Amino acid sequence: MFVDQARIFVKGGDGGNGIVAFRREKYVPMGGPSGGDGGRGANVILVADEGLKTLMDFKYRRHFKAERGAHGQGKNMHGAWGQDLRVKVPVGTVIKDDESGEVLADLLLQGQEAVVAKGGRGGRGNARFSSAINKAPSFSENGEPGEEKWIRLELKLLADVGLVGFPNAGKSTLISRVSAARPKIADYPFTTLVPNLGVVMTKERDTFVLADIPGLIEGAHQGLGLGHEFLRHIERTRVILFILDAAQTEGRDVVEDYRILYRELELHNPDLLKRPQLIVANKMDIPDARDNARRLESELGKTVHCISAVTGQGVEELMGKTYALLQAAPQEIPSGEEPVVRRFEEELPFKIDKVDGVFEVSGPRIEKLVVMTNFNSDEGLQRFQRTVIKMGLEEALKEHGIKEGDSVRIKDFEFEFTE
């Protein structure tokens, strides 16, 4: 089964907790704090691997969680960092944020990597909080939670040349003749349900990769037929061959076929039509095909290359011309993805909503503070109070009409407001 889309959940490892410890050694009467920091949580990293051809593995496993960092120890010993989780994906995989659709990475090269979920930093041990005012702090930080998100993986094949045509135009027959690829061939539409790749060798022993992609129909740019399945894979090709049924065996007109194919590519992505292309009239072994090819050339005013994929007539010459076009084509084809433009504005530390009589406070900074605070320590609680006051939470709550004894909730931490 060829799987070219997947949706997976990734979570970076949580940071290890810092600890509270003091030196208790003979001959060290004033040992002081010695709690070590927690280790950093591991990242989730996707790695491009030429050995993989589909996203099939992600059909059965959808959750990937990296290990957390180790907790700190006494004697100022820091916790070990988590070992990064590396997940292999096929070369040509595009990684997108599932919620926003933003392209996070496009893995085009063997071994190329992308960090998709960062591990949290380790919490600081009490030794970090020692100061002239507080020489023996009895609190530490918890580790920071790792980043987590759902992401989408889309595989776009890396081929030099793409075959564009209606179902039963003879694309599969052509690729089976010019390469060792053996796609399924039969006399009904959509025989090819998955892309096929073949390596072509010209008579001069030059090689290139040809993609036989599922047949196109009118309305494909809107997803009809195999629409988006087809169009996604054609985006990376550097040369396009329009394969047309000149014998009109399906009852369609060959000129109209070309115009529909051209229009579908234009509606999907006009840049596709800027690439080098050849118009190929197939099935020259069938009566009337030659006359239809002449009519096609006359009406379009463009050169039409006549072949028979069944008998091999004209195929060798076509592959030579295709390679010549490929040599002149740009080496890199843009992905077609819209650039993401961000306008950076000052981020508010929190926002306040009143829900069922409870003042709910949310925001990345203040939620991170809650998660990393050890509320079992009086000093840790006092540090939390000082920090939120500096952030302006107390004044903001008063502006929202909070009164003595009202409840405040930040993530899972709930407390009563007192002045």
From Swiss-Prot:
Mg(2+) binds at residues 172, 192. Its cofactor is Mg(2+). One of its GO terms (biological process) is ribosome biogenesis. GTP binds at residues 165-172, 190-194, 212-215, 282-285, 308-310. Residues 159-327 form the OBG-type G domain. GO terms for cellular component: cytoplasm. It holds the Pfam family MMR_HSR1. InterPro entries: G_OBG (IPR031167), GTP-bd (IPR006073), GTP-bd_Obg/CgtA (IPR014100), GTP-bd_prot_GTP1/OBG_C_sf (IPR036346), GTP1-OBG_CS (IPR006074), GTP1_OBG_dom (IPR006169), GTP1_OBG_dom_sf (IPR036726), OBG_GTPase (IPR045086). Keywords: Cytoplasm, GTP-binding, Hydrolase, Magnesium, Metal-binding, Nucleotide-binding. It is found in: Cytoplasm. Residues 342-419 form the OCT domain. It is an enzyme of class 3 (hydrolase). Residues 1-158 form the Obg domain. Belongs to the TRAFAC class OBG-HflX-like GTPase superfamily. OBG GTPase family. An essential GTPase which binds GTP, GDP and possibly (p)ppGpp with moderate affinity, with high nucleotide exchange rates and a fairly low GTP hydrolysis rate. Plays a role in control of the cell cycle, stress response, ribosome biogenesis and in those bacteria that undergo differentiation, in morphogenesis control. This is GTPase Obg. It comes from Syntrophomonas wolfei subsp. wolfei (strain DSM 2245B / Goettingen).
